[in-house]
Structures are given as structure tokens and as C-alpha cells.
Amino acid sequence: MPSIINASVPGSEANTSEINYMSDDPAQTANEKIYPKDKGYAWVIMIACFFNLGFSLGAVNSIGVFQTHYLKVMFATVPAEMIAWISTASITTTLSCGIFANMIASRLGIRNTAMLGSLIGCLGLLLASFSTKIWQLVLTQGVIFGFGSSILINISLSVLPQWFDKHRSFAMGLIASGGGFGALFLIPIITKMLEVSSFAWAIRVLLIVYALIAGISSFLVKPRIPNTGTTISFDYKVLSDPTIILLSLIGGFIQIGTSIAILYFPASIIDLGYNPTLATNLIMVFSVFSACSRLTSGYLTKKINAVNILIFANFVTSIIFMALWYNSKTMGTSLTFYILFGIFGAPYFAVQPIIVSANYKYEQISSINGVVFLIMGLAILIAVPSIGKVFQTLGNRKDYNQIITIAALSFFIATIFSIFLRYSLLKKQVTSNRNKNSN
């Protein structure tokens, strides 16, 4: 049976070359050059989108370093469920607010919107560097920085498919790996600054790096097809699409399980008797394997059905949580879990945008990604504070088994929904082929 990801759907990647989805900067005109796909400036777009995701999602993936600092140093006497609101706000806003990117870009243009996102992100980090209370960090590091990053992420995921056809799977896999490589770059910087200086200067150094990289990358982003004055609003039809609903549910449950590992694994290493520096440095190990997994998953979708990758990866992840991290008392077992989690827990973040770009019209991509990420963000909003409460009351801030069980169940539920997704896409493909034959 042919792979669903390569199925030809009317209006999908094979038929989007002349769709003007988001307007470019107002200064551009319809007389400007239309760039070719898969070559030339397309590679500049890919690199720019890679860095946008790298330093937006990379900063979010580095939240585990700050979470450990909050739990063990900065807010050591504050209940864990209160501290969890910082990471909750950061992850939730970063994921969910991208739904506004389409509406902003239709008025300001892609480049201006991307630059606005990077500017808002910089403002959030600047204000966070002066914050000393939890509510201040929720607002600055969480909401303001998260909103700016969400705009960059949505723009990058939505504009790239317009530039690639033949090499789309590779390009999407590469930018999806950006968050892992970004975290690999940022984590040692943040960790070192927390050691030798202060929290405030750790944030300020992050601000300098983010402003430089995201600012340049945002300026380089533009649509392949020049502005013709078209304004595209949110496509509400995607809200009732079974495939989109399933993708959103899968993402939501995966995000719950992922957040537990990202936020609590470093702290669990400290509780085994190791120092905080080693614990946070292990996040880099995770980031390497996660980034490579996302890049590889994107490439594998050309050979293996994308949903089959999801089913297998989600099921394996649910097993390793219980087999390796649950009740772990040794560094070897815990590290093995973290490495395998980086490999098998990451494919969704690479194959989800590939599935969307292969099965839907280009002008729907931003709306679909916005909905999927919104559900993922809402899942974090509901789950992370609850997980913090479980860790505080049932685990007494020392026992991780209860939240590990929650993570394992989340990935198992995602496995079930992934099976439903496969049948949904099969049905979609059969319907599409039937319509073609009838015409």
C-alpha cells in the first residue's frame, strides 16, 4: 500500500505553486520575481526557518534548566505547583498563540510579522531579566516571550511548504529538528551563566543571542509568491475535520508526556545525588538525540508511512517510561531512558507538519498548524499545574513515579489516536481517489 504521506490530494503540495496565501511586505508588488522551488533562495528560507524554530523552541526546550533552578534555588520554599505556572505559561503561549500569526501576516506581511514576533520575544526576555517573583516570570518569560516565539514558529512552519516540493520532507524534518539543536546551543550558555553569575544575566545573555539570530532570520523570511493584495482569514472548516481533530489530540497527549520528562527529569537526577550542572547538561544529550530523531523522521516519511512512524514511536515511548524511568535508582537506567525518549518521543513534531502539508491546501496550513498547536498548548495549560500538584502532594517533591505513570499513559493514549488517524487518512485517500475517478 502506498504511503499516505505521498498521496496526491487536490490542492496539496503538488498543486500549490500558484497559491498566494500570506501577503508579503506591503512594499512588495505583484511585479516582483516568483522564485523557483527547491533551489536558490528556497535554501535561505529553510535555514532562516531552522534558526527561527531553533531559538524559539530551543528556548522553550531549555526551560528544564530554569525549572531546576526554580525548584532547587530561586523558589526552593515555594510549592511545586506554583512554580509550574512559569513553564506552563511559557509552553502554553508558545504553542497556542501561533493561531494569530495568519491574521497578523495578512495585514503586515510575512517578513514584518516574523520581525514583530522576534521583537515581542526580545521584550519578554528583557522584562524577565528584572523579574524576581513567580507572577512576573509567568507574564514575561511565559506570556510575552511565548507569544513572540509562537508567531515565529507558525510563520516558519507555514511559509516553508511554499518553497519546497521535491525536498519538502527533508526541509520540514530539518526545521523540526531546530528546537533540539537550539537547545543544545543554549543550555550550556544558560547553565554556565547560572553558575558564574545570576539568573538575571542568564536571561540577558539568552536575550542577546535570541535577538541576534531571530532578528536576522526573521528579516530573511518571505513568501515565494509576491503580494497581490489577497487577505486570507482563519479557515474554520478545519475545526470539524476528523484528521485535524486526531492530529490535535495526539499532539496534546504527547505534549503532556513530553513536558513531564523535560521539566522533571533533571530534578530527578539531582535527587539521585548528582550535582545540578550534570543534571542540566544531560538535557543537551536529550537534545542531540531528539534533534537527530526529528531530522531522521522527516526523511523516513519518504520511505515509510508517516502515521506508522507515529504509532510505533508513541507505543515504544509509553513502554520506556515504565520500563526505565519508573522507580529508577541508578544513573545508567535513567540516562538510557532519556536517550531513548529523545529518539522515540520526538517524531510527532517532525511528521505532523509533513502530514498537514501533504494532505491539505497550502492556504489551510497556517490555520491547521494553529489549531493543532492551540490544542497542544491547552493540554499543557491544564496538565502541567495538575502534574505539579501531584508531584507536590503525592510525590512529596521526591517521588517521581506518579507523574511518570501519567506520562506513560499519555503516550499510550496517543498511540491509540494514531491508529485512528491512520484509518482517517486512508478514508480521506479513498474518497479523493473516488472523486478523481468520477470526474
Where are these regions (language model features)?
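Extracytoplasmic gate region of multi-pass secondary transporters
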Residues: 55, 59-70, 187, 241-301, ...
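A late C-terminal transmembrane helix in Major Facilitator Superfamily
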Residues: 359-397, 407
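C-terminal ends and interior cores of transmembrane alpha-helices
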Residues: 119-132, 218, 315-329
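Helix-to-loop junctions at the C-terminal end of transmembrane segments
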Residues: 97-110, 293-306, 391-392
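Intracellular juxtamembrane helix-capping segments at the cytosolic ends
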Residues: 70, 142, 149-164, 171-172, ...
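Cytosolic juxtamembrane N-terminal segment immediately preceding the first transmembrane helix
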Residues: 2-57, 220-237
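Hydrophobic core of transmembrane alpha-helices in multi-pass small-molecule transporters
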Residues: 50, 54, 124-125, 135-151, ...
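C-terminal transmembrane helical hairpin of 12-TM major facilitator-type secondary transporters
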Residues: 272-274, 278, 286-290, 294, ...
